[in-house]
């Protein structure tokens, strides 16, 4: 299987077991793994978790409550800053050899459940290593797989643990069916694609609509050796956006952000570049009932009315829809609307260039994108902006630089993936709340009392759908109508190509590809060329 060389190490999650595991079909459900059982307060202010006495690391040593407490403190001191922010004031203590107690500074169901997914790492190994340190040998682990071979930046091989302690637990039945899994790292996606067609690896998830429509051809496809599998994704959808860094003066005015959005001709791009494969993003809860796809209901208005003076008027009177064009490549109406917005914001046209009416400074910004990314849309977007007198400079950097600049918010605009949420969760704090303004998840740099107030209510309403429904829709309206990010697209289907040597369960999971439930099919493999079996 392929991955980008600069990506996080593939499948590291299979090295460590978690206290509980979630279901790929049931959002919000947790089943015991390292944990044997749990008792907790009705308000989720504390929990005591009993560790399964059978749980073992790969060296045979038992998993203890001390390992759980150690892992939490390791993440608090060496993990990402967001973890420390979320769990500030939380205590995790071993109160018995196989019992750990978690206490939150205040009741919070979402934060407690997130800790139920904590991977358990062995104190015996990690007390002598930092999470940021490069390792010359694989770490001691405890999950269904261990690393058995690797070459830095080229490949890593995972082998199934034959005496894995949890192999027969109900949560693992039918899972982890491959003896060996190898991941190869590629710098260039085109090279990776050709390698896949030639049989260098077995499975490819395709994110390019053009590739899917035009390049999956040749003898191996014609003979049925490679199978193209496309099926509709019915779950909450990941969506693509362009984040405006609203901390930069150029994008501090909502009218400028809306004008830039009007210049993004999705309809033409989708027809000319993407073979009609994408749908336009229009919500941060895409494909869920929490998306604000109707006029505000009375319960939403009750939430929004006290903050009316701080909100765009459209929040109360219109349903958010991104601007649409006729797809011919020159949308005069949208460009005229954009021009008017720029004029109103104090950016006037002078010698075919937008300049600040007071300072004479030209309206220009930099789009930061990853080298080798799908960037067909960039030049048409740049051309449309030029028609408005706006200059968009393009800066391509490698993934390491992109990550560093994202973390330091050193960009004007950058593409971002908004990860799907099946319901409005406490995780929204990290992405939008003022208390997390330094979080790299808050790509636009939003600091809004209105957003803070809604998210605080969302956190307090966890588990109460009657309250979450109007809160989620109200937040969706506030975020979209403020144009903190420019909505790009999403792909409503999963597209996977594979060499035909695998079988899959008849019922697919809703929220993932379910690769951990696939298995090697000897009969199918026998029909392939000998070197590809």
Whereabouts are the PLM-identified features?
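A structural "hinge/loop" feature
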Residues: 1-10, 31-36, 61, 107, ...
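N-terminal lobe/hinge region of extracytoplasmic solute-binding protein
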Residues: 1-42, 50, 73, 140
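Detector for C-terminal structural segments
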Residues: 10, 104, 140, 151-156, ...
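Gly/Pro-rich hinge or "lid" segments in bacterial periplasmic/extracellular proteins
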Residues: 21-26, 116-182, 187-191, 198, ...
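Aromatic- and charge-enriched surface segment that lines or borders ligand/interaction sites
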Residues: 36-81, 95, 101-103, 186, ...
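Surface-exposed binding/hinge segments that line
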Residues: 50, 84-127, 135, 144-151, ...
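Ligand-site clamp/hinge motif
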Residues: 52, 133, 164-217, 258, ...
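Extracellular/periplasmic solute-recognition and catalytic clefts
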Residues: 91-94, 148-159, 184-248, 255-259, ...
């Amino acid at each position: 299987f392929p991955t980008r060389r600069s990506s996080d190490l593939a499948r590291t999650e299979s090295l460590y077991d978690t206290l509980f595991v979630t279901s790929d079909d049931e959002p919000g459900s947790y089943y015991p793994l390292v944990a044997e059982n749990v008792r907790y307060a009705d308000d989720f202010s504390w929990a005591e978790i009993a560790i399964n006495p059978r749980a073992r690391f790969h060296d045979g040593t038992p998993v203890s409550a001390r390992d759980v407490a150690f892992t939490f403190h390791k993440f608090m001191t060496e993990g990402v800053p967001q973890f420390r922010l979320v769990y500030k004031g939380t205590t995790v203590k071993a109160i018995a050899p196989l019992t750990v107690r978690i206490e939150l500074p205040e009741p919070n169901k979402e934060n407690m459940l997130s800790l139920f997914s904590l991977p358990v790492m062995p104190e015996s190994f990690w007390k002598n290593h930092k999470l940021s340190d490069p390792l010359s040998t694989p770490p001691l682990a405890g999950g269904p797989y261990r690393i058995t071979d690797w070459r830095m930046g080229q490949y890593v091989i995972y082998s199934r643990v034959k005496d894995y302690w949890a192999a027969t637990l109900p949560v693992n039945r039918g899972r982890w069916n491959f003896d060996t899994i190898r991941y190869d790292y590629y710098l260039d996606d085109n090279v990776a694609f050709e390698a896949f067609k030639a049989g260098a690896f077995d499975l490819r998830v395709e994110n390019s609509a053009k590739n899917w429509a035009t390049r999956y051809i040749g003898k191996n496809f014609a003979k049925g050796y490679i199978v193209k599998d496309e099926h509709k994704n019915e779950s909450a959808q990941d969506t693509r956006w362009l984040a405006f860094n609203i901390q930069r003066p150029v994008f501090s005015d909502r009218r400028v952000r809306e004008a830039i959005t009007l210049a993004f001709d999705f309809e033409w791009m989708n027809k000319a570049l993407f073979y009609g494969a994408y749908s336009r993003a229009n919500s941060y809860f895409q494909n869920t009932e929490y998306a604000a796809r109707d006029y505000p209901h009375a319960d939403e208005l009750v939430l929004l009315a006290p903050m009316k003076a701080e909100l765009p008027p459209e929040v109360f009177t219109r349903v958010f829809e991104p601007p649409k064009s006729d797809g011919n490549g020159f949308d005069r109406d949208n460009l005229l609307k954009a021009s008017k917005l720029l004029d109103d914001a104090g950016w006037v046209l002078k010698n075919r260039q937008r300049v600040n009416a007071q300072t004479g400074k030209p309206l220009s910004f930099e789009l930061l994108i990853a080298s080798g990314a799908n960037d067909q849309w960039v030049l048409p977007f740049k051309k449309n902006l030029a028609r408005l007198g706006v200059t968009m400079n393009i800066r391509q950097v490698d993934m390491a630089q992109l990550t560093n600049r994202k973390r330091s918010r050193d960009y004007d605009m950058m593409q971002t993936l908004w990860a799907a949420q099946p319901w409005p969760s406490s995780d929204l704090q990290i992405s939008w709340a003022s208390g997390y303004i330094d979080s790299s998840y808050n790509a636009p740099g939003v600091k809004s009392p209105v957003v803070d107030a809604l998210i605080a209510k969302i956190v307090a309403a966890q588990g109460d759908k009657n309250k979450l429904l109007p809160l989620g829709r109200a937040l969706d309206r506030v975020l979209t109508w403020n144009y903190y990010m420019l909505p790009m697209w999403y792909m409503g289907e999963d597209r996977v190509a594979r060499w035909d040597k695998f079988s899959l369960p008849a019922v697919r999971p809703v929220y993932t590809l379910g690769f951990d439930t696939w298995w090697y099919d000897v009969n199918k493999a026998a029909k392939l060329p000998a070197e590809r079996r």
